[in-house]
Amino acid sequence: MDSLHIGSYTFSSRLILGTGKFSSPGVMLEAVKASGAQLVTVALRRFNREQPGDDLFTPLTSIPGITLMPNTSGASTAAEAVQAARIARELSGSPFIKVEIHPNPQHLMPDPIETYEASKILAKEGFLVMPYIPADPVLAKRLEEAGCVSVMPLGSAIGSGQGLATAEMLKIIIRESTIPVIVDAGLRSPSEAALAMEMGCDAVLVNSAVAVAGNPPVMAEAFAEAVAAGRKAFTAGIMEKSGMAVATSPLTSFLGTEA
């Protein structure tokens, strides 16, 4: 089986699903089930068992095969992210943490300096750190060296639906990385997820494109199928582009060349 390996964990699905923006917890749960995702990210504020309306922890962990990846969304500094990660591990018991630090609410770009500092600390504390980062090959390599178990470069701005605007940088990160590269943010359609996988990404994380769809569970299923197809195409070996036409059948001796 062509499995996804992150740290000591193995997943058969290469689609990771976010849980924000859904119209209701019920719709979100149906989408998670339809997606077949095994790794799901949840904001710290959704770990609230005393407020059932805000609690996603209990219903998500009732789905067989689900592993939670808490995230530090809302943190604007490394110190805030580290504190949030420690609380999340205590509440969830999960070793995974998605380090997400975007101090400017206007564009939500991840802060590379604060992200690196937080990731370095958390990796030393035994977390399985998966940082959300700009599509920066140098930063990605530094985070790998700091002990992160994957890097999650953005395709484009969170919730923008602008697709793989960073494709050329993603290709460099994929080529140089020895840990999983997971495209996170900006994907609008299943075809973009398939393209990311064809490029050689190890997985994709999708949230808004599923959450705001007319039928989130069906869209989640479509993304799952696209991710699987893209991965299959990548492993099969995609043909190289050519600057000129290349005949599929030899054109010599067409119906014989005798006079």
From Swiss-Prot:
Its EC number is 2.8.1.10. It is an enzyme of class 2 (transferase). 1-deoxy-D-xylulose 5-phosphate binds at G159, A185, G186, N207, S208. GO terms for biological process: thiamine diphosphate biosynthetic process. GO terms for cellular component: cytoplasm. Pathway: Cofactor biosynthesis; thiamine diphosphate biosynthesis. Catalyzes the rearrangement of 1-deoxy-D-xylulose 5-phosphate (DXP) to produce the thiazole phosphate moiety of thiamine. Sulfur is provided by the thiocarboxylate moiety of the carrier protein ThiS. In vitro, sulfur can be provided by H(2)S. The keyword Secreted does not apply. One of its GO terms (molecular function) is thiazole synthase activity. The keyword Repressor does not apply. Homotetramer. Forms heterodimers with either ThiH or ThiS. Keywords: Cytoplasm, Schiff base, Thiamine biosynthesis, Transferase. It comes from Chlorobium limicola (strain DSM 245 / NBRC 103803 / 6330). It is found in: Cytoplasm. The gene is thiG. Belongs to the ThiG family. It comes from the Bacteria. The active site is at K98. InterPro entries: Aldolase_TIM (IPR013785), Thiazole_synthase_ThiG (IPR033983), ThiG (IPR008867). It catalyses: [ThiS sulfur-carrier protein]-C-terminal-Gly-aminoethanethioate + 2-iminoacetate + 1-deoxy-D-xylulose 5-phosphate = [ThiS sulfur-carrier protein]-C-terminal Gly-Gly + 2-[(2R,5Z)-2-carboxy-4-methylthiazol-5(2H)-ylidene]ethyl phosphate + 2 H2O + H(+). Disulfide bonds: none annotated. This is Thiazole synthase.
